[in-house]
Amino acid sequence: MFIINLLLYIIPILLAVAFLTLVERKALGYMQFRKGPNIVGPYGLLQPIADAVKLFTKEPLRPLTSSISMFIIAPILALTLAFTIWTPLPMPHSLIDLNLGLLFILALSGLSVYSILWSGWASNTKYALMGALRAVAQTISYEVTLAIILLSIMLINGSFTLKNLIITQENMWLIMTTWPLTMMWYISTLAETNRAPFDLTEGESELVSGFNVEYAAGPFAMFFLAEYANIMAMNAMTTILFLGSSINHNFTHLNTLSFVIKTALLTFMFLWVRASYPRFRYDQLMYLLWKNFLPLTLAFCLWFISIPVALSCIPPQI
């Protein structure tokens, strides 16, 4: 039974990730006045399956100078963490109901840094290492703001449990009262997942492909799946934190449909941003965080600490 539950949990994520790549290519295509994939199957719908078959049937090559064990472990770790981050998310029921769900997700997103660092270091090439160092600095930096925003949400919510957030937002979505935090959270998730306009880790013009430049076939596909699973997980988190993932506790199917639609719209915005904005310069990326986001999030955090003290009330505040 446990194996069946695990498969029912993993397979939908894999299918969603596979077709997200197709939606991205189609969306970017139409935004650039071209068709996108349209040969494999009707309207190109079988393109993700063709890509998967191609990648997993190729021979996985590696540099002679690479560190074998770490080179293989890095993509497996990336994919495992990308799947594990989904377990505490209430959709509307979670696979594991954790009291410290918010902390668990923050810890896992911090662990994903190791897969990037190991892949860059184990490749033993300068471009991969430079890409990995960039990615690690960027990810660790933006986790600071994500942690402070989560602390502010926790102060409003009154606990670290994700299910409590649904109860907090029964009357009003948190985006209504904390819209500056929502904007900063969304931009930080773009940087955290290494997406455009913050995709400096891939920097094609100077780093070829970034930390995964030496990967091919199956291991490369694992990194690819992990990246898109993380994107969807982050958007699912945004939905739970700010967009009130539940409508009516009596209709769980309606709640799930609402959750999926909101997450899909947020994910489409990721693709829209990629099509619209040019890449940031690295110093601009760091200045945005340390000179703009950090002071603002700290100020908002102090504000949310002072409200219960000033009004002598206990959370949830909404």
Swiss-Prot record:
Gene Ontology biological process terms from the UniProt entry: aerobic respiration
Keyword Membrane among record annotations: yes
Localization (cell): Mitochondrion inner membrane
Chain segments annotated as transmembrane: 2-22, 68-88, 100-120, 136-156, 172-192, 223-243, 253-273, 294-314
A GO molecular-function annotation: NADH dehydrogenase (ubiquinone) activity
Entry keyword tRNA-binding: no
InterPro entries per record: NADH_UbQ_OxRdtase_su1/FPO (IPR001694), NADH_UbQ_OxRdtase_su1_CS (IPR018086)
Catalytic reactions on record: a ubiquinone + NADH + 5 H(+)(in) = a ubiquinol + NAD(+) + 4 H(+)(out)
One annotated Gene Ontology cellular component of this protein: mitochondrial inner membrane
Enzyme Commission number: 7.1.1.2
Enzyme class: translocase
Keywords of this entry: Electron transport, Membrane, Mitochondrion, Mitochondrion inner membrane, NAD, Respiratory chain, Translocase, Transmembrane, Transmembrane helix, Transport, Ubiquinone
UniProt xrefs under Pfam families: NADHdh (PF00146)
Record's bilayer topology term: Multi-pass membrane protein
Family label: Belongs to the complex I subunit 1 family.
Role played: Core subunit of the mitochondrial membrane respiratory chain NADH dehydrogenase (Complex I) that is believed to belong to the minimal assembly required for catalysis. Complex I functions in the transfer of electrons from NADH to the respiratory chain. The immediate electron acceptor for the enzyme is believed to be ubiquinone.
Protein name per the record: NADH-ubiquinone oxidoreductase chain 1
Organism: Trichosurus vulpecula
Species classification: Eukaryota, Metazoa, Chordata, Craniata, Vertebrata
Encoding gene, per UniProt annotation: MT-ND1
